[in-house]
């Protein structure tokens, strides 16, 4: 099974360079076009899980009308820095934030906490892929759902998925970049997860 981990398309807050955590703007026109490109890239024979925030739900619905909302895929809580430009984060706080994954921004969430909740989702998805429940009634009896899975989420959860796939800590967050509407691919097998590609934007440059 292949796991597609997708970042939502662009919002106006992204376009303005604001830190965007739990605030809930929808996609802008660019973001909607990006969502269509993502949908074309992953196809429609997939299961789709999404963060509850609008920008992810709108991206997910470009892929499928049948989506499952999972609150654990929500973006990092930036606390009092949500919807503020990075330059407004005091230098000493920014330095500590980057150095320590257990650092909690005022009113917010730590990267350790985020990593734990995202890993829960990924562990469940992997378990279902490797040992799928089987129907015992009707035409579907004995036929597990072996479709690939798409997770539509945000920057920080995608970095947590990267850490999960590589078996490393959340320190990797500050050493990686996740573009809007990018696709990260992770193979799941009995041997565990394997990173196939990270932050691919090839589908966004297609005519």
Predicted regions and their residues:
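Generic structural signal for well-ordered alpha-helical scaffold segments
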Residues: 36-40, 115, 119-130
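Conserved histidine-centered catalytic loops in small-molecule metabolism enzymes
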Residues: 43-72, 187-207
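Phosphate-handling substructures
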Residues: 63-120, 197
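Acidic, low-complexity terminal tails and accessory targeting/binding regions
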Residues: 79-88, 132-147, 163-207
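Short active-site segment of divalent metal-dependent hydrolases/proteases
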Residues: 11, 157-158
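Generic beta-sheet signal
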Residues: 3-4, 46, 145-153
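Short beta-strand scaffold positions
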Residues: 50-51, 116, 152-153
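Active-site-proximal alpha-helix that buttresses catalytic centers in soluble enzyme cores
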Residues: 1-66, 109
């Amino acid at each position: 099974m292949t796991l597609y981990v997708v970042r939502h398309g662009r919002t106006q807050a992204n376009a303005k360079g604001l830190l965007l955590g739990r605030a809930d703007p929808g996609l802008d026109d660019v973001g909607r076009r990006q969502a269509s490109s993502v949908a074309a890239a992953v196809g429609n024979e997939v299961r789709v899980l999404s963060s509850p925030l609008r920008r992810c739900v709108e991206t997910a619905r470009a892929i499928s009308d049948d989506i499952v909302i999972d609150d654990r895929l929500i973006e990092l809580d930036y606390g009092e820095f949500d919807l503020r430009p990075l330059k407004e984060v005091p230098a000493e706080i920014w330095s500590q934030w980057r150095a320590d994954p257990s650092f909690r921004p005022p009113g917010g969430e730590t990267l350790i906490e985020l990593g734990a909740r995202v890993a829960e989702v990924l562990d469940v998805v992997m378990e279902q892929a490797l040992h799928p429940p089987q129907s015992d009634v009707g035409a579907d009896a004995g036929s597990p759902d072996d479709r690939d899975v798409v997770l539509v989420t945000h920057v920080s959860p995608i970095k947590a998925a990267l850490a999960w796939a590589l078996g490393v800590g959340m320190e990797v967050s500050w050493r990686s970049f996740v573009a809007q509407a990018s696709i990260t691919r992770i193979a799941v097998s009995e041997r565990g997860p394997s990173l196939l590609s990270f932050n691919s934007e090839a589908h966004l440059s297609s005519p």
